Amino acid sequence: MTAAALRRTPLHQLQKEAGARFVDFHGWDLPVQFSSIIKEHQAVRNACGLFDVSHMGQVWVTGKDALPFVQKVNSNDAARLKPGQAMYSHMLNERGGIVDDVIVSCFGPERWFIVVNASTREGDVAWLRRNAAGFDCLVDDQSDAMGMVALQGPAAKEVIGAVSPGAPALGRFGALELQLWGESCIVTRTGYTGEDGF
């Protein structure tokens, strides 16, 4: 795919100005490094690093049957989540095979937020919409309207606390809706680095 045909996140220009080296990741022009991979790895292990993960899918499921629907399509028990909690789960097909691994956040019995992987986003959203037939709920793909970053590392709690005083109080797999700089944001205490993060 040519560089002109690659999709770009809302942070692309800032990353370019910061000297990022970009790679094609499933049709997205994403930064693979800024200074050195080793320095950036050490930053995440010893302090913190910020990852642009806007390429991942961001899907709201809302409506009267949102909980029964989310319960149907996930391997873990969504009914055990209270508002403000999230879980790692798998979406399963009718044979029990894995469609994708996801993070599911509960913001009330009628409001759920699901983060799906970039490489399977379009298929995941289509699959969710097909499976929503018969449920009184809306599957709303907000992926192109939202950016997403991951702040990861032992100092992540301190750094996020400087801009969002409520976020550090979240427990592991906690979820919070808030306003930052006049914008609606979702903060979850999750990540894939093995370090603490948001």
Segments and roles (model prediction):
Residues 1-198:
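Basic, glycine/lysine-rich polyanion-binding surfaces/domains
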